[in-house]
Amino acid sequence: MKKTLGIIGGVGPLATMFIGEMIVRLTRATKDQDHVHTIIDNDTSIPDRTAYILDPTKENPVPVIQKDAAKLVAAGAEVICIPCNTAHTFYDDIAKASPMPVLHM
């Protein structure tokens, strides 16, 4: 049984599109229905991760990422991924708040 993948995007909009393309290209599919069911939330309003890491008085991106994960789960995602190296600095806080697994890079 295939799982539905939720992608928290916008933390590098091109990275979001790149991972989507790679998932399609690397899936061994002979027809459309063989592909991974994917839900993408390309949320470009997520505060700058690097700015917050360098200066914790800046806006914390974690609550927005957690909210996006919750939206994806509500939409049917059974596993979450975030195509952003910097966002994984906050992996523990994001994963702890998600009822579904969050893939780590």
Label the model's feature ranges.
Residues 2-60:
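N-terminal glycine-rich anion-binding loop in soluble enzyme alpha/beta folds
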Residues 51-52, 89-97:
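Metal-dependent catalytic neighborhoods of phosphoester/phosphodiester hydrolases
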Residues 7-8, 82, 105:
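Small/polar loops that bind or transfer phosphate-bearing groups
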Residues 31-33, 94-105:
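Short, acidic/small-residue loops that bind anionic groups at enzyme active sites
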Residues 56-61, 79, 99-103:
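Short, flexible loop segments at the rims of nucleotide/cofactor-binding pockets, characterized by
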Residues 15, 19, 61-64, 68, ...:
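General structural feature for long, well-ordered alpha-helical segments within catalytic domains
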Residues 75-91:
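N-terminal glycine-rich "phosphate-gripper" loop used for MgATP/nucleotide binding
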